[in-house]
């Protein structure tokens, strides 16, 4: 299958200045970018007068696990029976027929990273996937992209009558399973191919092996400054990879975050603060952190903010002082890097997935319409 987009103004998320060119996609991949391209048998799209952006990317949310008009029956992103559930997998709960996914695609969002919420100290794995499809296995780029953990008010609130009444307890529970997972890994590695020497199988600890081996990061929900730095401290203690999600108080600890040198996903920022740890949320935060040298993505945390409004979150960050090109990258290339899938998505480059959002105006404008979205070279209808 061939797709030829002709005459559009290309915003590729690599070069700061846009340029006019044609894009040829073959079998879902970008095959060529240049002037006066031709391809026999290709579907030709006249993009004259349109801006061509890479498909937008969400670094952190819960779309597909909780969507429109679903209530309890369709809310599957928090498991309230145990605060430590690393064995849970987002791919086992995502509903590809959730209407909010299709709506997100029509809004130019082509890739999302979705997973468990923040009720649990350790919630399970996130999945990175395309926003169209019928079977999550076929939609996935990474079926297990990160291991969710959470700090702050949410674990305390959800388990205050059972097992957690303080931030100290939250941290202790996380450290406990990391200690046990490290020992489990040691025994598995020592056993090698000798099955008789393997430790007794433990589903929770087995699920932690990719974290302990550095294959996936801990994806830490943290709003308040002390919670953010606790996540950094624990990740450093155990030598595991880390990404920070929300980072509401990030502007208060800029130097510390620069030193930590971990990817940050900032948001959601629309709406008034609904709890104490959100009191410092501001559209200035993404720009402050970005200017300091932090790796910043902007997120909706869907369904907190509708997924289709991701580009408007970037627009508000620009209004708060963020460089426009950096804000554009914060919803394309940077979240792809945050997730670990920038070899596939996040920019318009030869060899990457043919995911595009064609718009009749500037990405950040409320007056701009998404005229067409393409995922793997196919139109989203």
Regions found by a protein language model. Give the residues of each.
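C-terminal cap of metal-dependent C-N hydrolases
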Residues: 6-12, 337, 349-381
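Divalent metal-coordination and catalytic microenvironments
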Residues: 8, 23, 28, 49, ...
């Amino acid at each position: 299958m061939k797709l030829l987009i002709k005459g559009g103004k290309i915003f590729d998320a690599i070069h700061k200045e846009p340029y006019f060119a044609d894009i040829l996609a073959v079998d879902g991949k970008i095959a060529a970018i240049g002037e006066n391209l031709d391809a026999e048998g290709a579907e030709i799209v006249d993009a004259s007068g349109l801006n061509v952006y890479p498909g937008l990317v969400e670094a952190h949310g819960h779309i597909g696990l909780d969507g429109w008009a679903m209530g309890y029956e369709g809310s599957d992103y928090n498991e309230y029976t145990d605060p430590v559930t690393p064995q849970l997998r987002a791919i086992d709960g995502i509903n590809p027929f959730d209407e909010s996914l299709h709506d997100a695609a029509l809004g130019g969002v082509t890739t999302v990273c979705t997973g468990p919420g923040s009720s649990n100290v350790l919630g399970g794995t996130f999945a990175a996937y395309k926003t169209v499809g019928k079977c999550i296995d076929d939609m996935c780029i990474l079926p297990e992209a990160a291991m969710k953990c959470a700090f702050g008010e949410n674990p305390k609130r959800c388990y205050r009558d059972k097992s957690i009444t303080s931030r100290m307890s939250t941290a202790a529970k996380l450290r406990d399973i990391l200690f046990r997972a490290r020992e489990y890994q040691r025994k598995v590695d020592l056993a090698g191919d000798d099955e008789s020497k393997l430790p007794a199988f433990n589903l929770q600890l087995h699920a932690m092996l990719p974290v302990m081996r550095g294959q996936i990061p801990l994806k830490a929900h943290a709003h308040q400054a002390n919670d953010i730095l606790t996540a950094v401290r624990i990740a450093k203690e155990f030598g595991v990879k880390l990404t920070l999600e929300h980072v509401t108080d990030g502007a208060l600890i800029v130097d510390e975050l620069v030193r930590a040198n971990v990817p940050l996903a900032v948001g959601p920022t629309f709406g008034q603060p609904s709890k104490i740890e959100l009191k410092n949320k501001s559209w200035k935060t993404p720009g402050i952190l970005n200017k300091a040298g932090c790796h910043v993505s902007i997120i909706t945390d869907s369904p907190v903010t509708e997924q289709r409004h991701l580009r408007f979150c970037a627009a508000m960050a620009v209004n708060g002082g963020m460089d426009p090109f950096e804000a554009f990258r914060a919803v394309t290339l940077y979240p792809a890097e945050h997730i670990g899938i920038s070899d596939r998505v996040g920019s318009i480059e030869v060899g990457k997935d043919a995911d595009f959002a064609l718009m009749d105006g500037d990405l950040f404008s409320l007056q701009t319409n998404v005229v067409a979205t393409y995922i793997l070279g196919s139109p989203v209808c």
